[in-house]
């Protein structure tokens, strides 16, 4: 589909990838060698780490806070001592903090991120919130998790999986490190399914967000990448198929705000 008269053009390199993958060759709408992508993504998040909350507010018009609350509510963390969760691409701690609080401060959450700048922000926030004793911070790659098989009761990832070059590898690793009976939850920007809202959100995303990002941070390019990466990410049904292919069962998803974001769930049974 292409749109004319100054509207967003979404053809070719701008089409979403399917259930067979392909994100490893795209940096936003730019075609890149798969060996380059991780470094390019790392550069983006080094730049935005200190203003990550502002970035999410721009991308979601502030709704990411509501969606994250809903994610943790659906997870329903156990309040029994010893319950463990792995939050991947969770550097600044938004999901992990919510999980610890929802568990009555019983849960132990490992926050894993490939980006040290993001983890640094998360540690500072955890100390200020008095949650540091419930948390562990690990700098590592989602495609090669440094944990034994069957290690965690839950695996969460919010607004991070679209930045992983090989999504299939990340999903396989998620399955591997979960205990039998463990839960996978992924919150990600997705395909807007409501007529009119999709066009409004496109205009906001492609026209306004990079400009506002430049005004606030002096960096328009990082925000352009983040917007473009959303448009490349698989549709809800295609991503659900990828989760099933990794071995998960009872896979389902919920749309938020007309599909601007979707929350996917799966179980290791």
From Swiss-Prot:
EC number of the protein? 2.1.1.163, 2.1.1.201
Give residues annotated as binding S-adenosyl-L-methionine: 92, 113, 141-142
Q: In which pathway does it act?
A: Quinol/quinone metabolism; menaquinone biosynthesis; menaquinol from 1,4-dihydroxy-2-naphthoate: step 2/2; Cofactor biosynthesis; ubiquinone biosynthesis
Q: Where are the transmembrane segments?
A: none
Q: Which residues form a coiled coil?
A: none
Q: Which reaction does it catalyse?
A: a 2-demethylmenaquinol + S-adenosyl-L-methionine = a menaquinol + S-adenosyl-L-homocysteine + H(+); a 2-methoxy-6-(all-trans-polyprenyl)benzene-1,4-diol + S-adenosyl-L-methionine = a 5-methoxy-2-methyl-3-(all-trans-polyprenyl)benzene-1,4-diol + S-adenosyl-L-homocysteine + H(+)
Pfam families attached here? Ubie_methyltran
**EC primary class:** transferase
Record's CDD domains? AdoMet_MTases (cd02440)
Role of this protein: Methyltransferase required for the conversion of demethylmenaquinol (DMKH2) to menaquinol (MKH2) and the conversion of 2-polyprenyl-6-methoxy-1,4-benzoquinol (DDMQH2) to 2-polyprenyl-3-methyl-6-methoxy-1,4-benzoquinol (DMQH2).
Question: What protein family is recorded?
Answer: Belongs to the class I-like SAM-binding methyltransferase superfamily. MenG/UbiE family.
What is this protein identified as? Ubiquinone/menaquinone biosynthesis C-methyltransferase UbiE
Per the UniProt record, the lineage of the source organism begins with: Bacteria, Pseudomonadati, Pseudomonadota, Alphaproteobacteria, Hyphomicrobiales
């Amino acid at each position: 589909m292409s749109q004319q008269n100054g509207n967003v053009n979404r053809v070719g390199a701008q089409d979403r990838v399917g259930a067979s993958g392909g994100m490893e060759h795209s940096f936003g709408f730019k075609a890149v060698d798969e060996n380059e992508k991780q470094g390019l993504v790392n550069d983006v998040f080094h730049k935005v780490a200190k203003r990550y909350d502002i970035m999410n507010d721009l991308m979601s018009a502030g709704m990411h806070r509501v969606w994250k609350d809903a994610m943790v509510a659906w997870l329903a963390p156990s309040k029994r001592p010893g319950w463990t969760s792995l939050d991947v691409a969770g550097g600044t701690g938004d999901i992990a903090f919510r999980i610890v609080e929802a568990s009555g401060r019983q849960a132990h959450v490992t926050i894993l991120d490939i980006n040290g700048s993001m983890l640094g922000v998360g540690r500072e926030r955890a100390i200020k919130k008095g949650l540091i004793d419930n948390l562990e911070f690990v700098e590592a790659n989602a495609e090669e998790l440094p944990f034994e098989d069957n290690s965690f009761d839950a695996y969460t990832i919010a607004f991070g999986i679209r930045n992983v070059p090989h999504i299939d590898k990340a999903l396989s690793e998620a399955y591997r490190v979960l205990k039998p009976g463990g839960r996978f939850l992924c919150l990600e920007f997705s395909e807007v399914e409501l007529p009119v809202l999709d066009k409004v959100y496109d205009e906001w995303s492609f026209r306004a967000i990079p400009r506002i990002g430049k005004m606030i941070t002096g960096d328009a390019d990082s925000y352009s990448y983040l917007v473009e990466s959303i448009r490349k990410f698989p549709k809800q049904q295609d991503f659900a198929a990828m989760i099933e292919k990794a071995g998960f069962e009872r896979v389902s998803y919920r749309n938020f705000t007309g599909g601007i974001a979707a929350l996917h769930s799966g179980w290791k049974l």
